[in-house]
Amino acid sequence: MKLVLFGSSLVSAYWNGAATYYRGICKAMFERGHQIVFVEPDLYERQQHRDLVQDPPYAQVRVCQGWDELSVELDRAEGADLVAKCSGVGGWDQELAEAVLDLQSLDTRVAFWDVDAPQTLAAAFAEPPDTPRTFRQLIPRYDMILLYGGGPPVQSAYEIGRAHV
């Protein structure tokens, strides 16, 4: 299975507490025979503070300089088995949240991978419920929501629509 993940950073934990979590999941998926592509924007000086000097063997890392390069990676993700937009990328979050949904097809599942549910849900519930194109309106369109904790309260909060949590 080919997985394309749009996240904050796999190679730098600088201002990025999710890096080690991403590494563990990506490595485990790779060891099970899956191909991993991790797309990350060059933000917050993360590339200058990499703690993985070399890209890891378990993922292709693609660092993007701005939205134009992220758009190219979105095009390249077409046809992947799973495309996931991770929470807290740090730039172009709303644009990515919308754009990955355009890749959804019978062959491509699209997920939202929430690595900071309290923050994500607080922001979503602060949005007007009927305003189009907000993250809150996008939630039901994802095939699934991936979480690493929170239990029933977080699951029920995400049941805004029909996404599988």
Each model region followed by its residue ranges:
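Extended catalytic core of nucleotide-activated donor transferases of GT-like folds
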Residues: G7, R23-K27, R32, V37-G161
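Short amphipathic alpha-helical segment that frequently serves as the phosphate-/nucleotide-binding helix
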Residues: N16-R23
